[in-house]
Amino acid sequence: LRLVVHGRSGGRIPACCLALADAVSTARQAPVLIEALTAETAPSSPPLQHQWLVPLLLLPGSHVRHDLPAIRQRLRGQGADVTLLPFLGAWRPWVAMLRHWLSRSMAEPSRRVVVHHPLRPGPAERYLHHLARELACPLVPADAWEVFVQRSPASHPLPLALAPNRMSELLRQAGGSAALLEDPVIRSGLIDLLVALP
């Protein structure tokens, strides 16, 4: 498996993502590589005959539409046979895990609001409408959160962020939940999903 995460500036990979890759590698008894989209240069990797490219991305933004096909082409150019899986946010079991995550929230259902990274109009917007129906709660872009909470001050923010980032930290300071991989149930469920891949 080659996991693809957003990463931080300079290609740094959050510790919770590295720990996830280690746990999956141990359970599968096979190498699990991890790559950050923010890396300035592609990581060196051992020559593997076949790789499953697993985008641990929650939304279908430009990374999903442009960067992932470029990574696949790069790996194919290195002689690997690559299978690119859909982004994590499109997996039905993952959406079920998000529903369970919401149901475990301490906030009353009417106060729950999922806050996500802002996206450009287009396919991402359609996905967000679909996800809002699936989760039965409002989804608000992070850059609109301040306005939203002024209109609905009792709202409880739940960050749609796999690893801690600026958005999740700001929301946590406002009384929101932790990033998804900081939730033991989500972390364990994602490990199980990745271990079950061929």
Per-range role (PLM):
Residues 1-198:
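Active-site-proximal alpha-helix that buttresses catalytic centers in soluble enzyme cores
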